[in-house]
Amino acid sequence: MKTFSKKILTSSIGLLMMGGGCLQLTFAEEVSVLPALKSEAQAQQQNYADGKLAKEAKLGALGNKSVIDTPFSVTTYTAKTISDTQAATVSEVLKNDPSIRETTNSGHLNENVQIRGFSVGFEDYNINGLYGMAPTGRIPTDIIDSVTVLKGPNALVAGMAPAGSVGGVVMAQTKRANQDLTRVSASYEDDGYYKSGFDVARRLGNNKEFGVRVGGSYGQGEHIIDGMDDTNSTGVVALDYTTDKLKLNFDAYAVRDKRDNGSPAMVGFIPCTPKLKASQCTTPYKLMDAPSGDSNFFPNIHGEQSSQYLGASGEYKFSPDFKVFAGAGYNEKEYSGHIFGTRLIVNNTNTGAASSQYYRVGYQEHAVAANLGLEGKFDTGAIQHTLGLRADYLTRNYWQHSAATSNAFDTNLYDPIVDASEQMPTSYPTIVPYVDNRYVSYTLTDQMSMLDDKLQVILGARYQDIDTQNLYKKTKYSSDKLSPSLGLVVKPFSEDLSFYASYVEGLSEGVTVSDITYPTATNKGETLAPYQTKQYELGTKYQVGSWLNTLALYQIEKPEAYQDSTSLEVKDDAETRSRGIEFSTAGQLTEDLSLMANLAYIDAEYVKSGTASQVGNTVIGTPDFTAGLGLDYKIPVVDGMSVNARASYVSEQYLNTDNSLELPDYTILDLGAKYATKIGGVNTTFRANVNNLTDEKYWSGVFGSNYAILGAGRTYKLGVTFDF
């Protein structure tokens, strides 16, 4: 266990003092009625910190809830945050909170994160509160309007994540025709990546009941690391018909990514064992300093991925107190080439000599999702109820082939070797049917309010049914679980100050004991029962004007599988526990200066394990302390000009489960500027951003045990938008 250092404590006090005051479908989430367009001033009143954070969040089975009335830790980053930071993907948006750790490199085609010590993979990102409908790999911001992060497991709000993530729920909200818009944009990144796009929205009809929004983007060129060339394109359509009683939506997106000549890398420091070859492990076993963030260890790589989606949804209000809703959607995803597995292993820590190899994988997925529900409001005496009943359905069918590999090739951590003879495999197996999974759940919620909203209670439960088939191994598995939840919000002094407590659970599929994962197990073929992760949380929230201040304390307990060393049976009574404290503050210090800051302390450890020496150790990739500070200043003497800065600090984190290797702490500084003016009567906004201003060389996090993630080097981005 690490100690809470004096340096960390000093940083905490300082920040606390400063924080005083594709084709895409929207399912049956509540959509804002749009009888009239909102002015910018009205929109700002619905947000914190000069429009960067939303005051309301869309929370799946609970509907739309204000942040102050939600008994969980939830943050929604708005379109303004996305545009001012020029974030290209959801993962780049999440960098506003350093406690959300990336477990894949910046710029990787697969974006995975860690929240509160537990992973959230890209397969478990969702669109508009539902799983299975997000693009493969990563979500480009060109198709979305906001990003909501609900920290910790929450089966009540979102159901069981199909890949088993329990660290949190990452929900992207798609674009909607909220107001008339005709926008053309262009951007340039250092090394020659150019991108252009358009975004057009209209409200039509006598009462503005019809909405249309169409957008697209295309980018191509070298960026992020030396020689890596990307070609990216998106297209999105959103249609809606909105009246006081009826809401109908149609959405579609298409996303394409093509990558050549490079990929960000994970670097392995693997302890040697008798079973490993010299090219598969590290000697002497120690950590090396990080190389330059723009190093390219895979110059002959190629990969591409695509996603497309269609769907429709509707909602009808029979009265102000009763409504029904339904939705359905279809998603196709595929990838081919060397998309992931971009890893090298350091063989000699004295010289930096390393080895790696190229892979080729293939994957296709078809997913269907649907929901049906109703919501009614009624009173029982002095208690106001909002009762919800909802059914959700998701099926995922996918095909894949085993990875084809090339021969291992030599390289060097500090001097990557370029050898044209080392190429990706040219032959590979045929894609075959692999998995057919079905998830059905039923949710019942009762949101109660009494004493003029001074006391609010959420009671809920989700019944989850799981049916999985491995078509390749010809195995089947079915199980079900009930996940109860309880939330309490108390406002004894003011409607702007709340205290809350909650208990929620998260569900993950039980592990299947196979020859590959447990070759010596005595219970091969058995699938363990679904894991129930439990979270207990206490907190307080205070809002005043543009300010939101939050404080949360939590504990998460997650069961884990392990193999008993005596019986050789695979069991599921190991446990990882995470405890932490999180503080955030956001608002306007003055009319011209806004702030977003956050602090987090986490103690994540293995409390039960099949390896006795591991008990009490810190979970890999979980820094004890993270801190972030973002400032945005409007320069009074230059109308339309503003500058912004963001500093992120991450303390030390362990690379392996025995805690013998530790990644150093680091601080990253990002700078930006924006200038809004009119050119020829056209509203024009120029933006410039520099990430990692000081070009730090650092290990940003942990991909998996013994694999460090190489942090991105300094990058530049220039952008301009024209609003006609």
Language-model-derived ranges and their functions:
Residues L34-D180, L538:
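Acidic, small-polar-rich N-terminal luminal/periplasmic segments of exported/outer-membrane proteins
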Residues E365, T380, Q384-R396, P433-K558, ...:
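Structural signature of Gram-negative outer-membrane beta-barrels, strongest in the C-terminal barrel
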Residues M450-K454, L553-E557, D572-T657, T694, ...:
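Gram-negative outer-membrane beta-barrel transporters
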Residues K258-C272, T395-Q400, V490-E537, Y542, ...:
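Surface-exposed extracellular loop regions of Gram-negative outer-membrane beta-barrel proteins
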Residues S12, T386-L387, V489, A501, ...:
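Conserved C-terminal beta-signal and adjacent last beta-strands/turns
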Residues G219-H223, T231, V236-K317, E332-E365, ...:
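Acidic/polar loop-and-plug regions of large Gram-negative outer-membrane beta-barrel proteins
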Residues G314-G329, K333-G341, F499, A529-K608, ...:
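Membrane-embedded beta-barrel scaffold of Gram-negative outer-membrane proteins
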Residues D142-D145, L156-G235, Y241-K247, Q308, ...:
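Outer-membrane beta-barrel translocator/receptor signature
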